[in-house]
């Protein structure tokens, strides 16, 4: 969803420039595009999030996708989550990727139990895992076990500069961060999750996918903002060859 003003049109133009189909994005007269403010100090930041209350609905004429990537949605989207849950249950061949945002964590496990139960790949950081599970334990394996019990088949947990972990319920993996000197960290988690998801969609193993994510995270934190610095597949593959 987008507002029918310059910021919204800029978003649409940027998506089109990068080859993203925008026909399912709703343009709403008289509404503003979501606008978030970032408080930036040293290499870290705090984001002040404000979601507009757009009308939402799952497209009826959509061709069955190979993957759905579900991330941050604002308050007032409970019915939309229900539609997504219903679609995923009715289309088990669709791989659901879930990277919950603030409101989705606030909704709690029970309201989203069918989302968790049918999730193919799940992404969060250590603090988010603790919040979702309502635990103080920061042991990665314990967090994996508790999250797998909710349903996700593959789980990825990031732990800042310590690196990232993955589990399929049988084996666990660890990947250190790609060596870099960060300038501003906004977008690192999104870059990691989306890049790993694409790698899985392309048929890469969990271990292979886990090598892709940190490279795009490394690149995006060299710049201000969440998009500048994102690598094309050719650029990413070159970094892999050079690693």
Annotated model-derived regions:
Residues 3-4, 9-27, 31, 39-121, ...:
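Ribokinase/PfkB-type carbohydrate-kinase core domain
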Residues 34:
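Glycine-rich phosphate-binding loop of ATP-grasp-fold ATP-dependent ligases
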Residues 150-152, 176-242:
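Conserved post-catalytic alpha-helical subdomain immediately downstream of the catalytic base
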């Amino acid at each position: 969803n987008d507002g029918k003003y310059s910021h919204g049109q800029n978003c649409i133009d940027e998506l089109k420039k990068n080859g993203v189909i925008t026909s399912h994005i709703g343009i709403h007269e008289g509404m503003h595009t979501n606008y978030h403010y970032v408080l930036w100090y040293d290499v870290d930041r705090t984001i002040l999030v404000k979601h507009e209350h757009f009308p939402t609905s799952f497209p009826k004429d959509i061709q069955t996708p190979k993957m759905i990537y579900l991330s941050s949605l604002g308050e007032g989207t409970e019915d939309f989550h229900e539609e997504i849950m219903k679609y995923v249950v009715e289309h088990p061949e669709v791989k659901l990727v879930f990277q919950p945002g603030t409101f989705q964590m606030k909704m709690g496990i029970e309201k989203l139990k069918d989302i968790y139960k049918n999730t193919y790949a799940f992404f969060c950081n250590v603090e988010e895992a603790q919040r979702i599970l309502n635990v103080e334990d920061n042991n990665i394996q314990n967090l994996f076990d508790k999250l797998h019990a909710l349903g996700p088949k593959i789980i990825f947990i990031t732990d800042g500069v310590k690196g990232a972990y993955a589990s399929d319920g049988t084996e666990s993996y660890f990947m250190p961060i790609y060596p870099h000197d960060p300038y501003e960290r906004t977008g690192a988690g999104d870059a990691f999750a989306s890049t790993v998801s694409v790698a899985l969609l392309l048929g890469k193993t969990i271990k292979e996918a886990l090598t892709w994510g940190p490279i795009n995270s490394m690149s995006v934190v060299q710049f201000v903002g969440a998009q500048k610095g994102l690598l094309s597949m050719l650029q990413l593959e070159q970094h892999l060859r050079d690693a």
